[in-house]
Regions:
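C-terminal accessory/tail domains of diverse enzymes
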Residues: 1-277
Length: 277
């Protein structure tokens, strides 16, 4: 989320992508001007005020260049790019396949820089791209692109990451309709300042959770899926008869939360309703 340790460049401010595009054009212009003699610190000066979080922190960014080539100190000139959105996998094999993907991406972009225009996702960033079905589709696109570029990858190599990050809650079949529940991603936002005995604190609202509901074999005109009696706004995945929705719910009631007057929604009850019967 926007207040995490590794927010995306387009996650907190809507104008950041516009500024990033200008910065990248400037880097291209300077490369054409200086060639191999381009000063390394120019990259730092060009991007350091863009690769930041909402408060301007240069370290808390998905791509942190604090230690790449900052002229401010010797510790800032280490040639390091931190990819802070990665977490340590629970198994060495999962770590190896992540490293293999990164090395292949670097090799590919070194030969052919990636020049596709940046997408303006808007609210889809926290709607579509928090759900495992669409993230898996996106990962399959990446694997297909890498294979087309001559780097042999298999989507099955990343199945453990998918199952680890989005564990299955359960599945049920009824009337030819299959309903699958998986844990999805949900940002825990940092809230406003509050006083405490030790000074000022800012809590994170950890009360929210998200579940993905995926339905296959459903007839739109006949079946409705509900959660606690409320119909779900299912969206097509592009596959006939397959639909997906994300359910955000309040799992518990902490003393400090974003909406303190809304009670906990758990437990959740999902129903497949046949409107013809």
């Amino acid at each position: 989320g926007p207040t995490s340790q590794s927010p995306r460049v387009d996650e907190a401010r809507n104008d950041q992508l516009y500024e990033l595009e200008i910065a990248l054009r400037e880097i291209e212009t300077n490369r054409a001007t200086y060639g191999q003699d381009m000063p390394p610190w120019l990259v730092d000066r060009t991007l350091r005020n863009i690769l930041v979080d909402v408060t301007g922190n240069t370290h808390r960014s998905e791509f942190s260049i604090d230690k790449m080539f900052s002229p401010d100190s010797s510790t800032g000139r280490l040639g390091l790019l931190e990819l802070r959105a990665f977490e340590m996998p629970p198994h060495a094999h999962m770590s190896v396949v992540q490293q293999l993907l990164l090395r292949a991406l670097i090799a590919r972009f070194w030969k052919a820089p990636y020049r596709a225009p940046a997408a303006r996702w808007g609210t889809e960033l926290h709607d579509r791209w928090m759900l495992p079905t669409f993230i898996q589709q996106d990962m399959h696109d990446v694997v297909a692109e890498m294979n087309a570029a001559g780097y042999a990858f298999d989507a099955a190599w990343f199945a453990p990451q998918f199952e680890f990050r989005f564990p299955m809650v359960g599945t049920v079949q009824s009337m030819g309709v299959e309903l699958t529940l998986r844990n999805a991603l949900e940002p825990w936002h940092v809230m406003g300042e509050e006083g405490s005995a030790g000074g000022t604190v800012r809590y994170a609202d950890s009360s929210l959770e998200r579940i993905e509901v995926r339905v296959t074999g459903m007839n739109e005109s006949r079946h409705v899926v509900t959660v606690n009696g409320q119909p779900l706004p299912l969206q097509s995945t592009g596959t006939t008869g397959e639909f997906v929705a994300g359910v955000r719910y309040k799992a518990w009631n902490p003393p400090s939360a974003l909406h303190p007057t809304i009670g906990a929604h758990a437990p959740l009850t999902f129903d497949i309703v046949d409107t013809w019967m």
